[in-house]
């Protein structure tokens, strides 16, 4: 990398031998400009960051001017983002300080002994396209419920997946957007994290079929359903043709008898309508407010408890997301669909109960003839 952190060349913190003074020295050090240095560059930087925590734009400007990581150098103004950049960058900074290998595992899924539609196993692999923070215990892996000969996910109570798929294996020039898959857990009482993203996949394998199979294996291994875009239906046909239609969630904003013929056949949600776009963005926004960065008002958790979103690539995608030009934000699309999948009850149409009015004709019986009461 050509990036050099600011502390290696910050004016006023270079000693007379040309070496940077990172931390506050026990004794004053003579600087290259013949001035005494009594404070470290990193200590100065950390104090400035602490003093600017309440002003998101000023903090991002300071990060851009004095970057310690590559992500600092490309910070955006919070006004330009749809989501809460302060929380997103708090989480990114926290993640940067972690030893990633202790929290995330890169790997691949494969069918046991190469036999499809049996059991799926996860294997750590430095070349794998999956990044996971949690795998279920043995008794929760590969849980499938069979109803009337159809396969359904056995861990729907634990979480769900969201997917931004593609239909064409390759395009001229080798471009094209990535396929993306995210897994997130619900609040649960099992031995699993709650409201936490546990899987990230953002890649474009050599063929679309490889992508479809990898998505299918992830769903089978975790035993969780998937909410995918049905604008690009090949992934959903792959699930249906292999007997996993029960894993593909129907769009949560419509009752079953209001679904189109294709939606009943394949499931999925059209991610092109304005209502769905707004619901999708609101789902991501709500998740960020509740589970990313610090909760300074202690509304959802303790003030000093950091959020649990460990996938920095997705965080960076959220920071740049443009709702009017969504094509290149694969990670945001799939992660938003995953959040919608675990809170589908929020999008279900309300049943309008109408009172049945039964008007019986009533008569007043006085005299020889009865009289209709109006």
Residues covered by each model-derived region:
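RNase H-like, metal-dependent nuclease domains and their acidic two-metal-ion catalytic environment used
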Residues: 4, 10-251, 290-374
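Short alpha-helix plus adjacent loop in nuclease-associated cores
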Residues: 248-296
């Amino acid at each position: 990398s050509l990036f050099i952190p600011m502390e290696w060349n910050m004016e006023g913190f270079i000693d007379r031998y040309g070496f940077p003074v990172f931390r506050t020295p026990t004794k004053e050090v003579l600087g290259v400009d013949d001035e005494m240095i009594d404070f470290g560059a990193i200590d100065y930087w950390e104090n400035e960051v602490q003093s600017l925590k309440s002003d998101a734009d000023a903090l991002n400007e300071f990060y851009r001017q004095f970057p310690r990581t590559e992500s600092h150098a490309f910070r955006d103004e919070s006004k330009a983002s749809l989501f809460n950049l302060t929380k997103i960058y708090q989480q990114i900074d926290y993640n940067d300080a972690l030893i990633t290998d202790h929290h995330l595992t890169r790997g691949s899924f494969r069918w046991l002994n190469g036999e499809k539609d049996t059991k799926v196993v996860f294997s750590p692999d430095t070349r794998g396209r999956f990044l996971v923070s949690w795998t279920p215990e043995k008794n929760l892996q590969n849980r499938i419920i069979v109803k009337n000969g159809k396969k359904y996910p056995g861990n729907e109570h634990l979480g769900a997946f969201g997917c931004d798929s593609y239909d064409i294996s390759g395009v001229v020039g080798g471009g094209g957007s990535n396929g993306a898959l995210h897994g997130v857990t619900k609040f649960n009482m099992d031995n699993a994290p709650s409201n936490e993203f546990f899987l990230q996949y953002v890649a474009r394998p050599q063929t679309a079929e490889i992508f479809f199979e990898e998505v299918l294996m992830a769903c089978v291994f975790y035993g969780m359903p998937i909410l995918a875009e049905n604008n690009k239906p090949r992934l959903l046909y792959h699930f249906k043709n292999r007997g996993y239609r029960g894993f593909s969630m129907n769009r949560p904003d419509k009752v079953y008898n209001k679904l189109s013929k294709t939606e009943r056949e394949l499931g999925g949600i059209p991610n092109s309508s304005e209502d769905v776009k707004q619901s999708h963005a609101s789902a991501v926004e709500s998740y960020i407010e509740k589970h990313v960065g610090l909760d300074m008002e202690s509304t959802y958790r303790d003030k000093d408890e950091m959020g649990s979103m460990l996938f920095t690539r997705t965080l960076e995608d959220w920071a740049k997301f443009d709702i009017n030009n969504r094509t290149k934000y694969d990670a945001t699309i799939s992660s938003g669909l995953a959040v919608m999948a675990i809170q589908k009850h929020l999008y279900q149409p309300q049943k309008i109960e109408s009172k049945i009015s039964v008007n019986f004709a009533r008569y007043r019986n006085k005299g020889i003839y009865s009289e209709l009461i109006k």
